[in-house]
């Protein structure tokens, strides 16, 4: 009996020793996973952006592009984010939605601009998506949902069906709660650093949770960002713990009105 117990202990210790040794190996460096992922991300970002633009034409009107660029640039400057790494695309689509793509592509649907109650509300959503980009949530989620092999196949001639599947995941699947909360809190920090009032971001969350948007049937953002009321509440709690600032309007009233009027004609 003692011999059997001793053999069992030896096997357990051997297993633990092998496990410990394997844990200490830099598998990412050995297999160049990071490099592979970066290369894949660049190709994937371009591929998916093309998929979405084919479905919804990109808006190039200065009435829309300039105000959006102003918001994004202001946030990037205030938070030491490389503006050239954030590639913004405003698409003509009535869905109330915005989402991040690999390689820093940020898609904003005109329906979101139309539904937003203020430039500050819109800024909150934009900052939330920028946070997903800066925190590398996009590729983490795609690898988790689909696997690296599927992503690689899409960039090496895997076919439009694979790209379409990935695009569907990004535009219609929620990040997990932990990543969403991290992006929310990061977004509030970005807003405050840029001297943009973060409370309208929480107001937007409250409003969509009640289905009070101008076009509730198109509230795609709420389907990919669930628990909006709960998130609005912890955003407000987080803001309360910060020093109050004298926030300035993120856009001139005339620029906001022009942009709203433009997208209204497209809805």
Task: Pin down the residues of each PLM region.
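A Zn2+-metalloprotease active-site environment signal
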Residues: 1-267
């Amino acid at each position: 009996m003692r011999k059997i117990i001793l053999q069992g202990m030896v096997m357990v210790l051997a297993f633990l020793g092998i496990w410990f040794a394997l844990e200490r190996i830099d598998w990412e460096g050995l297999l160049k996973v990071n490099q592979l992922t970066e290369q894949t991300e660049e190709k994937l970002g371009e591929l998916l952006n093309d998929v979405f633009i084919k479905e919804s034409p990109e808006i190039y009107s200065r009435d829309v592009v300039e105000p959006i660029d102003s918001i994004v640039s202001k946030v990037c400057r205030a938070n030491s984010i490389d503006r050239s790494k954030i590639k913004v695309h405003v698409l003509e689509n009535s869905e109330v939605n915005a989402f991040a793509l690999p390689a820093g592509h940020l898609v904003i649907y005109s329906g979101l601009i139309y539904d937003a109650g203020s430039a500050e509300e819109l800024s909150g959503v934009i900052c939330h998506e920028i946070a997903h980009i800066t925190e590398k949530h996009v590729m983490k989620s795609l690898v988790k949902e689909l696997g690296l092999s599927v992503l690689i196949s899409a960039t090496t001639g895997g076919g439009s069906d694979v790209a379409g599947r990935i695009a569907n995941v990004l535009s219609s699947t929620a990040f997990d709660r932990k990543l969403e909360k991290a992006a929310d809190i990061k977004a509030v920090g970005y807003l405050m650093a840029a001297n943009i009032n973060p409370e309208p971001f929480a107001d937007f969350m409250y409003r969509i949770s009640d289905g009070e948007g101008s076009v509730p049937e198109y509230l795609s953002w709420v389907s990919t960002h669930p628990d909006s009321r709960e998130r609005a509440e912890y955003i407000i709690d987080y803001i309360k713990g910060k020093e109050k600032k004298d926030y300035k309007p993120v856009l001139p009233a005339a620029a906001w009105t022009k942009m709203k009027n433009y997208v209204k004609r497209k809805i």
